[in-house]
């Protein structure tokens, strides 16, 4: 699969209202405030060609906590006139589910947040990537991290 010409990779990241609470109820889980990614296509010569990109801000149903804003630089004023998640989820899923491989750094976090948002929308199970790759996990040995 990794050598297939014209394979599509979607490299993405989310910014959110906070951290995942592993044991917490759905209401306390973070909301997406930004969804960004680049759709790439592997060429026959093993280079990657950019096909499309997305950088979408999302208006969450709660105020963005100050601590989260200090991390990613997105404040309530930046998303006040943006579309809510329910108006953008189909677009996000088209990128995620349409790629052969979805790539992210600490992708488990981004996947968790996507799934929480889908649960809130009554769409549990709509995120179905063919394959995922976590750059954080794949670099642990390379960087000699504990």
PLM region spans:
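Metal-dependent phosphoesterase core characteristic of DEDDh/y 3'-5' exonuclease domains
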Residues: 2-8, 28-74, 93-146
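Serine-esterase "nucleophile elbow" of acetyl-processing enzymes
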Residues: 11
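Short acidic, Gly/Ser-rich segments with clustered Asp/Glu that frequently serve as metal-coordination loops
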Residues: 14-23
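Surface-exposed cleft-lining segments at the edges of enzyme active sites
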Residues: 76-78
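Glycine-rich, highly charged phosphate/nucleotide-binding loops
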Residues: 80-90
């Amino acid at each position: 699969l990794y050598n297939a010409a014209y394979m599509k990779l979607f490299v993405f990241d989310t910014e959110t209202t906070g951290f995942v609470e592993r044991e917490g109820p759905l209401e306390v889980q973070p909301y997406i405030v930004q969804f960004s990614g680049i759709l790439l296509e592997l060429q026959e010569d093993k280079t990657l060609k950019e096909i499309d990109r997305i950088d979408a801000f999302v208006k969450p149903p709660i105020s963005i906590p100050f601590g989260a804003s200090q991390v990613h630089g997105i404040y309530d004023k930046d998303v006040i006139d943006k579309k809510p998640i329910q108006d953008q989820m189909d677009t996000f899923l088209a990128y995620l589910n349409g790629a052969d491989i979805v790539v992210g750094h600490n992708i488990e976090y981004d996947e968790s947040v996507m799934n929480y948002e889908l649960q809130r929308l009554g769409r549990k199970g709509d995120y179905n990537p063919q394959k995922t790759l976590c750059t954080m996990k794949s670099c642990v040995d390379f960087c000699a991290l504990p």
